[in-house]
Amino acid sequence: MAGALLCALLLLQLLGRGEGKNEELRLYHYLFDTYDPGRRPVQEPEDTVTISLKVTLTNLISLNEKEETLTTSVWIGIDWQDYRLNYSKGDFGGVETLRVPSELVWLPEIVLENNIDGQFGVAYEANVLVSEGGYLSWLPPAIYRSTCAVEVTYFPFDWQNCSLVFRSQTYNAEEVEFVFAVDDEGKTISKIDIDTEAYTENGEWAIDFCPGVIRRHDGDSAGGPGETDVIYSLIIRRKPLFYVINIIVPCVLISGLVLLAYFLPAQAGGQKCTVSINVLLAQTVFLFLIAQKTPETSLSVPLLGRYLIFVMVVATLIVMNCVIVLNVSLRTPTTHAMSPRLRYVLLELLPQLLGSGAPPEIPRAASPPRRASSLGLLLRAEELILKKPRSELVFEQQRHRHGTWTATLCQNLGAAAPEIRCCVDAVNFVASSTRDQEATGEEVSDWVRMGKALDSICFWAALVLFLVGSSLIFLGAYFNRVPQLPYPPCM
């Protein structure tokens, strides 16, 4: 008994399904047996078809700055009314919606006007929903690659305004009229709709605003009908963290190394130039990386490119400064003469201002009196030379202790043997050469000190130039913000 009842229920359910399918099939034949999809759904030729449009963004795939191409994944919601597909669900078993292939009904043929790859249409021809009263709804997905003029002035702290321009490929403004869709609360959706649950956030770009506007263009001079464009603007802001970590911070650190060249000795010009040129080469590599990222345009220079050019100029000036300081440090009295004014400014005044003067000289103790042993040696030499007894020499020494015996010695040396005179001349020559070398060493030391003074001046100048220039360049990016447009945020 229970089995028979179950079979009866299954049979009734199958009959009900079959009846429902028959009602849909009957509705299908009722609507499409005499339907012409190539004819516009109007009763009079001057009538206009109203098209309700809604764009839902599911993914901001990428913005290729090099090719100036924006890739997006969207759903295009299109609603309109076709009087030829009007029916009452009461006449067809309560069928509320009929799903039919899109090629069976009239379509407004909406395309993306500013596409870049020739794909004007949608990615998948979804079914069209036909509802009671002749209302049609079509929601096809699409992946668009559109043009986007990239402004690189403040890269990587920039924001871009990319547009999606839709229009009917076949019909003009007098044949179709575009309006924005309305939500369940009756509010007009005049922007790109972003479903926070379905939207996939982009790691490089954040969407700030996405307003839409409908713009009608006038016809030609002959009075022909114009076109209607639906323009959606995607105002996106770059997330600069990737570029800060991978480009800006290493670039600033490497550029700061060039200042370390001033801590090398003034005579080490080769090593200082090597440090500066190595930094210059590293900056060239960073500039090459930025050139591969930004579009090939002469309209503007990226902020990061301007910074790299600035630090390259600073590094070049430091190389020139190292060469000049090396030239000054290696000068000698035989090739150059130091003027008193230059000596005063660079060796006296400037070190005091910079707090880098030479250490104070330690006063030397007075030379001790000549010991008796040295006096005995002198007397022994005079005895040998003058052939006088030691007692007489001692007597003369006691009588002329303060200078007279030295004069007598010099007079008697004039009559001495030629060999002794040659020795004395050689000793005098050595003493004179030693005095000349000491004087020359002091002059060379002054030139080295002058090179150090120039190094100190240029170090502080380069440090101030580096800090001020870097601050001014990056502060410009701080003020480059998305303007507060009179549009609600997208998310």
Swiss-Prot record:
GO terms for cellular component: acetylcholine-gated channel complex; neuromuscular junction; neuron projection; plasma membrane; postsynaptic membrane; synapse. The chain crosses the membrane at residues 240-264, 273-291, 307-328, 457-480. Residues 1-20 form the signal peptide. Pfam families: Neur_chan_LBD (PF02931), Neur_chan_memb (PF02932). Keywords: Cell membrane, Disulfide bond, Glycoprotein, Ion channel, Ion transport, Ligand-gated ion channel, Membrane, Postsynaptic cell membrane, Receptor, Signal, Synapse, Transmembrane, Transmembrane helix, Transport. One of its GO terms (biological process) is membrane depolarization. The keyword Glycoprotein applies. Residues 265-272, 329-456 are cytoplasmic. Residues 21-239, 292-306, 481-491 are extracellular. GO terms for molecular function: acetylcholine receptor activity; acetylcholine-gated monoatomic cation-selective channel activity; transmitter-gated monoatomic ion channel activity involved in regulation of postsynaptic membrane potential. It catalyses: K(+)(in) = K(+)(out); Na(+)(in) = Na(+)(out). Its main location: membrane. Disulfide bonds join 148-162. Glycans are attached at residues 86, 161. It is found in: Postsynaptic cell membrane; Cell membrane. It is a multi-pass membrane protein. Belongs to the ligand-gated ion channel (TC 1.A.9) family. Acetylcholine receptor (TC 1.A.9.1) subfamily. Epsilon/CHRNE sub-subfamily. After binding acetylcholine, the AChR responds by an extensive change in conformation that affects all subunits and leads to opening of an ion-conducting channel across the plasma membrane. This is Acetylcholine receptor subunit epsilon. It comes from Bos taurus. The gene is CHRNE.
